[in-house]
């Protein structure tokens, strides 16, 4: 995703079904069908009234039709990390609209409450990745990758 983001591309539908791992453990991101080019000065990538993406993994700003950039993909990856370390999605009650509302509210249980065996700091890393305010998330995939290195 770092390379895509460096080219100004935001995936907007990052989810487990779009992450493939080959026999050499190399990750491949697929289905850029709703991806959009992001350039400095763009105010938004989606027309008002249109919701594009998978509700379980959508960033709050994407749900609200606000300006979307690479931090929306960081949010989606944070949701996937949450599922990996807890075994459950952060938000799953109700229909798609209810799940999207829960993402906007941002009141997921802390991963360490669900899985007390997490290494110190990993729960905070996941929560930071899923911050409702995108300025409080990791600001790039590279920054998130560097933070994850401690947990190899």
Residue ranges and their predicted role:
Residues 1-9:
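Protein kinase catalytic-loop region centered on the HRD/HxD motif
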Residues 2, 20, 28:
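Conserved catalytic/dimer-interface elements of ABC ATPase nucleotide-binding domains
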Residues 6, 24, 39, 93-94:
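Short connector loops in the HATPase_c
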Residues 9-16, 21:
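Catalytic-loop of the protein kinase fold
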Residues 24-60, 64-67:
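Activation segment of protein kinases
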Residues 56-152:
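C-terminal lobe helix-coil module of Hanks-type protein kinase domains
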